[in-house]
């Protein structure tokens, strides 16, 4: 077994990996960007090293900086988590070239299956049929039009080198193609470092069912069970469950065997997920994720297996020690991804900010995997997953009711969250009766009753039990040698020396609270004085109907300006594109008129309510 592992990631997955490493007696090394210096995953690790930069390209995608941290820390292996460099074959090769163990599949397998086009070829050559599509990448919008005219509309444009719905666009006809291709290429490059895209026929009402596999270097491959991930918005999962409800046992067995067949065909080693679309009794190969999935906890809860531990053991060269007949599944588990998004009206707008309150759900059958604690900041530069709430029950209905209870207890202030939408999903007759699909949230579910900027419903529950002090803030008390009148607090102080972070705890006199508005900005959950201010926003979101002001609905970065001063525009016409939390948001004109002023440039960072353009 490895003795020290560097976790090349952040947030929830870095914390998750660190916990299993601790149970196995493996020392952990965290890496962090400038914004994450005081982040939860840094506090959870035994050591931490600075990568520098704020945006992913300068930090968590910076292979050179990560390998330097691995060298300095003496790590024996690197766990990539999910996202970032987890499906980057060049990174895996670099790790191996430095004499370290990459906790994941071999680089050549990542090359083969991480490329969604070649993965289709592997599956089809092994006799596993895929969704109707093309086995080559697309560079010209005309190719999309030809594909749609031949096989029918709508068409799914997808990133060739990544999953999770990132970079995926669905076009209903030729008029939408050019803008969608450009946007898909931009998002694919931002998320996965490569802009290649490919095409598939978009099925009308499918369910997304994926199969968890694990394989060792001795040639043993087994499937652990399936997950239904059909509750999605923007082709990204909101809720997952294990096992898939109303899936015939013969289909389950066939799907599991198909997943093993694909895994053997590519000589897979490590944990992985083979994804399928299921419709009308048939299933189609979609892609293989050569990494640990976000939703792996539901499989863990039903099988009793620790998938991270399996990853680490297989990476160390150990056999699985587990045969197919040894895998048992008990009960039902549901996971809700608690994202910092405002689901009002079904828009799911990114909502970066500081968690002024975070009360986790607890109790029988409930598990919360979080990447943040109270007082931490959810940055616009990274994924907006705050936590995952998992509920287990002896059957689906028990798990559903337990999840509703857990969501009601989860209290988060400071950012909007997806919790109100997830409560609506769990309470809907279509979900209860398994009449939903991957398109159900956006086409059927009515979220118009959710007020903008609403907080999670756990306020009463957390107030009753008392929310804990924010990590990194002071723990009130008295020092062992202090009298009652001399109130002191136990303060955690951080010091960075030569790129390595050290933490020291000491008793200091309690300081009075500043009575006015916060005169500091938060960086990685820590207050930092001297933050650069910006003008007070004119309002939140786009201006009201008829307004001449186009405003940013959230904090983000301007990545495209689509009009110029003097242009005539119509109400609803796209003015610019704002990227927040790696999602593109198009800002539109709220009236007919002429563009009088463009107040931003490409690359500018704007805050919620900032005016980006004026139309007269």
What are these regions (language model features)?
Residues 1-273, 278-295:
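N-terminal beta-alpha lobe that positions the nucleotide/phosphoryl donor
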Residues 6-7, 50, 79, 156, ...:
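Structured core elements
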Residues 12, 204, 214-218, 228-229, ...:
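Short, glycine-/Ser/Thr-/acidic-enriched flexible segments
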Residues 46, 78, 212, 311, ...:
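Residue-level signal for inorganic ion chemistry
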Residues 259, 297-532:
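Catalytic cores of soluble metabolic enzymes centered on carboxylation/carboxyl-transfer
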Residues 477-503, 537-559, 565:
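Intrinsic low-complexity, intrinsically disordered segments
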Residues 538-616:
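Structured functional modules or segments
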């Amino acid at each position: 077994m490895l003795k020290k592992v560097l976790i090349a990631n952040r947030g929830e997955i870095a914390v998750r990996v660190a916990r299993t490493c601790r149970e196995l007696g493996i020392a952990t090394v965290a890496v962090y960007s400038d914004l994450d210096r005081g982040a939860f995953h840094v506090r959870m690790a035994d050591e931490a090293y600075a990568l520098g930069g704020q945006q992913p390209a300068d930090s968590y995608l910076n292979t050179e900086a990560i390998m330097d941290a691995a060298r300095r820390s003496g790590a024996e292996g690197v766990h990539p988590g999910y996202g970032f460099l987890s499906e980057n074959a060049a990174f895996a090769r670099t790790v191996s070239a430095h004499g370290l163990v990459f906790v994941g599949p071999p680089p050549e397998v990542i090359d083969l299956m991480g490329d969604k086009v070649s993965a289709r070829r592997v599956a089809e050559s092994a006799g596993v049929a895929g969704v109707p599509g093309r086995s080559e990448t697309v560079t010209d919008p005309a190719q999309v039009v030809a594909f749609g005219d031949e096989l029918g509309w709508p068409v799914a444009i997808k990133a060739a080198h990544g999953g999770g719905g990132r970079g995926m666009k669905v076009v209903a006809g030729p008029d939408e193609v050019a803008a969608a291709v450009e946007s898909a290429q931009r998002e694919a490059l931002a998320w996965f470092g490569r802009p290649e895209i490919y095409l598939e026929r978009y099925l009308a009402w499918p369910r997304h069912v994926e199969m968890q596999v694990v394989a060792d270097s001795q040639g043993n491959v087994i499937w652990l069970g399936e997950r239904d991930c059909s509750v999605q918005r923007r082709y990204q999962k909101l809720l997952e469950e294990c096992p898939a409800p109303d899936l015939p046992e013969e289909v389950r067995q066939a799907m599991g065997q198909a997943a093993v067949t694909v895994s053997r065909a590519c000589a897979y080693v490590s944990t992985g997920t083979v994804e399928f679309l299921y419709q009308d009794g048939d299933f189609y190969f979609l892609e293989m994720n050569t990494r640990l999935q976000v939703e792996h906890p539901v499989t863990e809860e039903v099988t009793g297996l620790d998938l991270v531990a399996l990853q680490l053991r297989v990476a160390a060269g150990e056999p699985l020690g587990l045969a197919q007949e040894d895998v048992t599944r008990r009960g039902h588990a549901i996971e809700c991804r608690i994202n910092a998004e405002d689901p009002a009206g079904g828009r799911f707008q990114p909502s970066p900010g500081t968690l002024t309150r975070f009360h986790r759900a607890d109790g029988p059958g409930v598990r919360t995997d979080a990447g943040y604690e109270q007082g931490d900041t959810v940055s616009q530069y990274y994924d907006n997953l705050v936590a995952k709430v998992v509920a287990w029950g002896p059957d689906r209905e028990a798990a559903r009711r337990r999840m509703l209870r857990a969501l009601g207890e989860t209290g988060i202030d400071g950012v909007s969250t997806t919790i109100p939408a997830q409560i609506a999903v769990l309470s809907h007759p279509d979900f209860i009766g398994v009449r939903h699909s991957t398109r159900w949230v956006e086409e059927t579910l009515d979220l118009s009753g959710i007020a903008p900027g609403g907080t999670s419903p756990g306020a009463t529950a957390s107030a009753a039990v008392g929310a804990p002090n924010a990590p990194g803030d002071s723990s009130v008390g008295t020092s062992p040698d202090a009298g009652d009148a001399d109130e002191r607090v136990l303060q955690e102080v951080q010091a960075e020396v030569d790129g390595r972070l050290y933490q020291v705890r000491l008793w200091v006199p309690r300081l009075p609270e500043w009575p006015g508005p916060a005169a500091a900005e938060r960086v990685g959950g820590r207050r930092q004085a001297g933050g650069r201010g910006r003008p007070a926003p004119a309002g939140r979101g786009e201006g009201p109907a008829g307004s001449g002001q186009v405003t940013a609905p959230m904090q983000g970065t301007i990545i495209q300006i689509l009009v110029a001063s003097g242009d005539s525009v119509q109400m609803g016409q796209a003015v610019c594109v704002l990227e927040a939390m790696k999602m593109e948001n198009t800002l539109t004109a709220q009236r007919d008129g002429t563009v009088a002023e463009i107040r931003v440039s490409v690359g500018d960072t704007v805050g919620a309510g900032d005016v980006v353009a004026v139309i007269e």
